[in-house]
Amino acid sequence: MELPAERTDGAYPNAVEVKISASGERNYTHYYDTATYTSLWTAYPLSAKHMGSISRPEEWSFNPNLSTSVQVNLCNRSYTNSDTYVRGHLIPNASRNGIKEMQLQTFYVTNSAPQIHTNFNSGIWQTLEAALQSVAKNETIYIVTGVAFAKQGESKTITYTTAKDDTKRVPIPNYFYKVVLKVATNSSGVVTSASTVGFWFEHKEYSNSTYSSYAISVDQIEAWTGFDFFPNLPDTVEQAAETNSLWTTFQNF
């Protein structure tokens, strides 16, 4: 339901779509750019069954679906400037700590990006993740988490870091975003209506955790990233849903 459309404009010639499964069930899918060692987006469903209280793993691991040569060794230690940047989950541990195998797969190094720890990863970003988890306790929602180095047509300086146990240069995202979907279906399971909302953050420290102030439409995030989100919705449903820019409208759908 939540997979973005295949990119055909040649913008990311080194990117591959990778499906991560656990016990025959799809856990999440990520669009991994081997040139930047970055998952440009990570898409996953979220419902009550995915969340629980399994203890957080201590170590990360390589993604077995990709060669280690195109991954950054963040297995045992983080980035060289780890006082500032941490391994920021794209699909959070707390969104998969109800099923052990799925949880461990969120600790693949490909499910991380360098993220400011203080007042971002541990602040507004974490608060948004918790809000989405709260909604998903009562219904299934569909999420795409992404990174961007620049908006479409924008010129932006990119800063790089390295891992303590690797020499590969890793670009630090200038933006992080999420787009989220809820659907309503008829008795035959056909989607009859939907609600979406997006969140777009400049990658910096925030003095508060009021994530709702950064809610925008999915249409706007599509314009900034060049990705087409939720293409599996019926066209009329998608067009109506992707104009919403209010968190409360999404919550109350």
Q: Where do the protein language model's features map onto the residues?
A:
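Domain-level detector for secreted/extracellular nuclease and nuclease-toxin modules, and
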Residues: 1-253
